[in-house]
């Protein structure tokens, strides 16, 4: 039995909400993936605050209709598609998809859209290679800590150097 008009409108509304929160959308060809494999992908994406939706291309077209941020997605809406919508850590979401695809070798990314711009395969891979927010914060904290340590050592070195010079002068004066 087909979907009712009300049901379709509900799906389009849900897609619009997800797109409003998303920063990045990836379009995957999910042909050949089992339900278990799709569930595995969804579980992996949950950790990066991302969702995977399988819906008809016409419903996604209606969801992006009139939204300039997502209008370019229309060119990718052919065939059997799953849509990965990434809200939080974009790099982690893309990494989760790429790890899944490497392990299964069944699915491929057709393309993506980030800030209204279509992404090539190379650009998507570059996003996955970026460090996560946690890694960046750790690097920044390490850099700040290193500067503070150098300042502390430098401040401590002035009196120590003065004390050594005075001691050397005093010892030199006795002889």
Curated annotation (Swiss-Prot):
SUPFAM superfamilies: Ribosomal protein L10-like
Pfam families assigned to the protein according to its UniProt record, in alphabetical order: Ribosomal_L10
Matching InterPro entries: Ribosomal_uL10, Ribosomal_uL10-like_sf, Ribosomal_uL10_bac, Ribosomal_uL10_bac_type
GO MF, one example: large ribosomal subunit rRNA binding
Keyword Lyase in record: no
Keyword terms: Ribonucleoprotein, Ribosomal protein, RNA-binding, rRNA-binding
Annotated GO biological process: translation
GO cellular component: ribonucleoprotein complex; ribosome
Family, similarity comment: Belongs to the universal ribosomal protein uL10 family.
SUBUNIT field: Part of the ribosomal stalk of the 50S ribosomal subunit. The N-terminus interacts with L11 and the large rRNA to form the base of the stalk. The C-terminus forms an elongated spine to which L12 dimers bind in a sequential fashion forming a multimeric L10(L12)X complex.
HAMAP family (UniProt xref): Ribosomal_uL10
Function: Forms part of the ribosomal stalk, playing a central role in the interaction of the ribosome with GTP-bound translation factors.
Protein name, entry field: Large ribosomal subunit protein uL10
């Amino acid at each position: 039995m087909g979907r009712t008009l009300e049901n379709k409108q509900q799906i389009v509304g849900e897609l619009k909400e997800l797109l409003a929160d998303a920063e990045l959308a990836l379009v995957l060809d999910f042909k050949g993936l089992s339900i278990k494999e799709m569930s595995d992908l969804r579980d992996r994406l949950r950790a990066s605050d991302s969702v995977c939706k399988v819906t008809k291309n016409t419903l996604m077209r209606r969801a992006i209709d009139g939204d300039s941020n997502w209008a370019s997605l229309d060119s990718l809406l052919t065939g059997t598609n799953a849509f990965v919508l990434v809200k939080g850590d974009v790099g982690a979401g893309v990494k989760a998809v790429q790890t899944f695809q490497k392990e299964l070798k069944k699915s491929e990314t057709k393309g993506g859209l980030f800030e209204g711009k279509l992404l090539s395969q190379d650009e998507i891979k570059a996003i996955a290679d970026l460090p996560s927010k946690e890694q960046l914060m750790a690097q920044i904290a390490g850099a700040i800590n290193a500067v503070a340590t150098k300042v502390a050592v430098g401040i401590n070195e002035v009196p120590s150097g003065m004390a050594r010079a005075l001691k050397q002068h005093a010892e030199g004066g006795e002889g």
